[in-house]
Amino acid sequence: MLRAFGAELQLTPGKEGIQGAIQLAKELVASVPNAYLLQQFDNLSNPEIHEKTTAEEIWEDCEGKLDALIAGVGTGGTITGCARFLKQKNPKIKVFAVEPSSSPVLSGGNPGSHAIQGIGAGFIPNVLDMNQIDEVIRINDNEAMDIGRRLAKEEGLLSGVSSGAAVAAALKVGNQPEFANKRLIVILPSFGERYLSTTMFTSIPAKPVKGNEYL
């Protein structure tokens, strides 16, 4: 998709993770005239814009009636900004962060490899305010992909693997007795078209459909 828009891709080894991509970006900025690095893991404008826009939209659409927010942590900007706004409106709102179970850095564990692109950077981003988070929920690769596929088949939502992880976490929260009949807000940040060539969708067995099957 990026190449279709004329972009030149500079790929880094998968084993280097996000840190490898950040390091290459810094090297490119140093060598390319007039280059600018957004630094989304460090730029305070990241959580600020979510506090001013995303969170306000959530509050207005819900008419102030929500009990919990569940979101994956990539840069940490979305969950930090939204949590700050929502907790100012209602301190009783609980905020749940989602991270890969094989890279439980937010839970105090060690970074590791995983297949949930978009979250689990392997370090705690500078823009992430852990004081806003009430609980961290760990989701494994299979859970994220399974729920992501179900979202497409059962709900008509073609979303990415990090969205699958967020909904998987929301289901766990919703199954807790204290959240029965409560309103949970889940942020789905990824669209599925970016994942059609990944294991998440290529593992779906092809099933031929007859033309008159739905007539």
Locate each region found by the language model.
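Ser/Thr-glycine-rich phosphate-binding loops at phosphate-binding pockets of nucleotides
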Residues: 71-79, 162-166, 184
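Alpha-helix C-terminal capping segments
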Residues: 3-4, 81-90, 168-178
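Active-site-adjacent helical/loop segments in soluble small-molecule enzymes
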Residues: 131-180
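Glycine-rich ThDP/TPP pyrophosphate-binding loop and its adjacent helix/strand module
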Residues: 49-93
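Short beta-strand segments
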Residues: 39-40, 72-74, 97-99, 185-190
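Phosphate-binding loop/pocket of nucleotide- and phosphate-handling active sites
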Residues: 168-215
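Small/polar-residue-rich loop-to-helix segments that shape phosphate-bearing ligand pockets
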Residues: 1-68, 98-152
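Residues at the starts of beta-strands that form the adenosine-phosphate
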Residues: 8, 92-94, 183
